[in-house]
From Swiss-Prot:
Residues 141-504 are cytoplasmic. Glycans are attached at N94. One of its GO terms (biological process) is transforming growth factor beta receptor signaling pathway. Keywords: ATP-binding, Glycoprotein, Kinase, Magnesium, Manganese, Membrane, Metal-binding, Nucleotide-binding, Receptor, Serine/threonine-protein kinase, Signal, Transferase, Transmembrane, Transmembrane helix. This is Activin receptor type-1. It comes from Gallus gallus (Chicken).
Amino acid sequence: MALPVLLLLLALPSRSVQDEELKLNECVCEGMSCGNGDRCQGQQCFASLSINDGAKVYQKGCFQVYEQGKMTCKTPPSPDQAVECCQGYLCNMNITAKLPSSKGQTLQGEAAGYSMETLIIVILAPVVVLVIFSVVAVLIIRRIQKNHMERLNSRDAEYGTIEGLIASNVGDSTLADLLDHSCTSGSGSGLPFLVQRTVARQITLVECVGKGRYGEVWRGQWQGENVAVKIFSSRDEKSWFRETELYNTVLLRHENILGFIASDMTSRNSSTQLWLITHYHEMGSLYDYLQLTTLDTVSCLRIVLSIASGLAHLHIEIFGTQGKPAISHRDLKSKNILVKKNGQCCIADLGLAVMHSQSTNQLDVGNNPRVGTKRYMAPEVLDETIQADCFDSYKRVDIWAFGLVLWEVARRMVSNGIVEDYKPPFYDLVPNDPSFEDMRKVVCVDQQRPNIPNRWFSDPTLTSLAKLMKECWYQNPSARLTALRIKKTLTKIDNSLDKLKADC
């Protein structure tokens, strides 16, 4: 009984599949085998694509025999023939056979052709854009420069026509006349701005007399007179601005401070230059002078006393309408001191100067990223313990540096026929261009000071100078002498020398 039932159950699905296979479907018929009709009936519908003599042939129709259709439909597509099959009413209407291999080749060919065009465009487009951009940039730059020069020329023309300005008769004046006028009619800090610009435009650069990391110094001529023109590099613009600001707002006319004439931002050789025009001193810097010249007692004292006088004038605050705030130099060294024809010196380069006024109790440090010269830095600067909000701290830094300059000068003073070669401070302890760490170790950690030669102690003047410089080098900043005290001490030494000569 169980066996017939089992056979019956196994036979049922077979008949169901057979019924499905025998079911006829109406299909879309397209192609040569369809005759005049566009429909056909079969057990399976198909859509085919074949390549005949290089041409694509599309056909749609039906398989009358299920097994034939089954075999054909399960055959994977070849490069030149493909068939898609389906079952259902007009199911092949919206299907299309595909030739993966043939299509891939066609697409690759198309892609190859397209890639070449794209490659040409990709190469040429940036070049064309770059050329256009460069041309436009050059035109814009030239236009800007032209407009800038036109503005400068128009301003000069305006300045020349304004009545009552000194600029209108500058050509008949000497620098001494102009500076004397500025001292009696204004702040005494320099020429009026319009005169400064006029003077600057009439200067001819003659020769370069010095170069440094922050710019160049030229000897120039104005109305037949020599002037010094310091041309600042673009990275030291803040120093130019600081010196210009300081000279134009503060009474700094002193025989031991470099005389300021004018400051201007001018255009030369299609570039903007920052000029600071001062008195010209043909003897050059104290650094250069000491390398070539030995000193007697009188010339040595004249140099150090004049430097001390200039520093004291900077440090002191003067009250009144012709007053000035207290100023700290912050970069005092032999290269920033110039030698005058009369044997005295004047202090130059105020690009790092700090100002302080007791009336307002304001400390004006400026906005200059430049730092002082590492070789001349005081211990508190090297170990970063300086009280940056206290003006006296900056003055004490100047005193440390003055002591080092005093040592440089004293080495070149002849006594008993003996003199040392010129050397910079700490020449025997640090390299030519010492690092911050080199100086910190020598000055702060080891607490070393420049060597005092034994022969100094056989000369009363050098003995006094050695004592004085040691009092400038105290590790404790507050223990150092003031600039005024140094000036008075040097004056006393100078007077005692004069008295000794008179007695002789």
